[in-house]
Amino acid sequence: MTNPPRILVVAGEASGDTHAAELVAALRARRPDLTFFGMGGARLAAQGVELLFDAREVSVMGITEVLPRIPRILQILKGLAEAAAERKPDVAILVDIPDFNLRLAKKLKALGVPVAYYVSPMIWAWRRGRVRTIKRLVDRMLCILPFEEDFYREAGVSARYVGSPVVEQVPSPDTATAFRERLGLSKDAPTLALLPGSRMGEIRRLLPDMVEAAKRLSAERPGLQVVVPLAPTIDREEITSRFEGSGVTPILVEGRAPEVVGASDAAVVASGTAVLEAGLMQRPLVVVYRVSLITYWVGRLMLKVAFVSLINLLAGRRVVPELLQGEMTPERIAEEVRRVWIPGAPREEMLQGLAEMRGRLGETGAATRAAESVLELLPPGRV
C-alpha cells in the first residue's frame, strides 16, 4: 500500500503560523490523506502538523538581534534538512522568513523536493537581487499582494497571485461598541489599542514608548481603556511588567488583534502584518518601529521604496503616519493619535485611504487558491 503524500511546512512568525495553518486546513479539505511535518507555532500544531521545531526559536529580526541566535538557527536549519532527507516529502511549503527559508530551499532543491513559497519576501522593496535565487530554488511563488505576480513573472519565476489571507482573517466591519461587547470591554469608554508586535525584541524596543504615550493620552481622556492583544509567542508578564509604575492598567486579550483594533478609537501598531490587519478594520492608526542602528542604516541603504507599512505601499502615498527610529517618541505617538482621535478632516482622510487600500486586496479565498496551486506540485502518481 502506498504511503499518503507527505508535506513539509515551515513557518517562523506568528502571522506566518496563521497563514500556514489556514493553508494546511484548505489542503486537508481537498486531500484528507495528506500528512504534514515541519516547524511552526500553536496554530499549525492545532491543525495536527507534527512540529519538529518551535517557530519562536527563529523569530528574530535585525543584524545585531540575530547574531546571538545564529548557532541555534543553523542547528534548526540542519535538523529540518535532515528530516526532509529522511522523510522525503512530496512537496515543501515555506512561509515568510526568507533569510531562513531560502537557505532551506537550497537544501530541498538538492533533495529534489518541489518548493512552494507562500507570502513572498518583499524583494521588490529591498534586496531585489534575491529574485535570481528565488528563480533557481522556488517552483511556485504564491503571492499575496496584487503587484507581486507581474514582478516575479517578468523575472522568470513561476508565480500566482492568490489574494491576501489577511482579508479573511479579520472579522466583518462593525461598530466599535459591538467589538467592545464581544471582548467584554466597557462600551462607552474611550479605547486605545496597542499592538507592539509578536517578537520579544519588538516588545523590548517598542512597548515602553507606547506605554508612555498611553500614559499621556490617559491623562487627557479619563477612563481610557488601553487594550493589548497578546500574541501567542509572547508571555503575559512581558507585557504587564512594562506597564508597572505608569499608572496605566492594560487590558490584555489573548490574540484577536483585529477585534481589539475594531474596538478602539485609534491604534498604535508595530510595522508588519498587523498593520494590514488593523487597516482592514477601518480604524485610525499610527505605525511605529525601531531596530538597532546597524540594522537601520543597512536597511536605509538597501530600501527601494518610500514607505515601510503595507498600507502606504499599496496606496502609493502616505495614508497612515510612520514613526520610525528617532521619530518614535511618546510625544510624537501621542500627537499623531490626537490628530485622528476625533471626527474631522485628518481622521476622515485616513479612513478614506484605508477603504481604498481594502479595495485593492481582492476577495477572500487565498488559502483555497494557494492549496490548489500546491497540489499542482505533487509528483505524478501522488496527485
From Swiss-Prot:
PANTHER family: LIPID-A-DISACCHARIDE SYNTHASE, LIPID-A-DISACCHARIDE SYNTHASE, MITOCHONDRIAL-RELATED. It comes from the Bacteria. It is an enzyme of class 2 (transferase). Belongs to the LpxB family. Pathway: Bacterial outer membrane biogenesis; LPS lipid A biosynthesis. One of its GO terms (biological process) is lipid A biosynthetic process. It catalyses: a lipid X + a UDP-2-N,3-O-bis[(3R)-3-hydroxyacyl]-alpha-D-glucosamine = a lipid A disaccharide + UDP + H(+). Its EC number is 2.4.1.182. Keywords: Glycosyltransferase, Lipid A biosynthesis, Lipid biosynthesis, Lipid metabolism, Transferase. Condensation of UDP-2,3-diacylglucosamine and 2,3-diacylglucosamine-1-phosphate to form lipid A disaccharide, a precursor of lipid A, a phosphorylated glycolipid that anchors the lipopolysaccharide to the outer membrane of the cell. GO terms for molecular function: lipid-A-disaccharide synthase activity; phospholipid binding. This is Lipid-A-disaccharide synthase. InterPro entries: Glyco_trans_19. The keyword Glycosyltransferase applies. One of its GO terms (cellular component) is membrane.
